[in-house]
Amino acid sequence: MPITEEITERLGNSVTCLRQKYLTEEMLSIIGNMDVLVGVRLHSLIHAAIMDVPMIGISYDPKVNSFMKSMGMKALCSVYDFEGEYLCEEFGSVLENREKILEKVKKHRDILVGRLNLNEQLIKGLLEGEEKICE
């Protein structure tokens, strides 16, 4: 059984599984209205961070683990060792500690945005031929 079907089956009506394609703006709007996002794909987790939504990552690839680590969190499990009861427990914990988790998400997101801005400045400096771009 695909993992999304198992999640939906175990959590019932409190879960919506998105199966169609959406424009980025639509997806951000949908995610922004969620209490918690359970994501397998990297971009769903990135969108949750952008929209200040607590996330639970289920890893299928090391990049998901790396992103969750950069957010000060860990992926709950991998798609290969998924256990529905762990997700239910984590889901409840995230809802219970939502505000504290949101603070962590915002803090780590802001750190990543700062790194992105620095990279942008460095690239711009290289393109403009600046001799000294780092101190």
Can you name each region flagged by the protein language model?
Residues M1-E135:
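Active-site anion-handling motifs in enzyme catalytic cores
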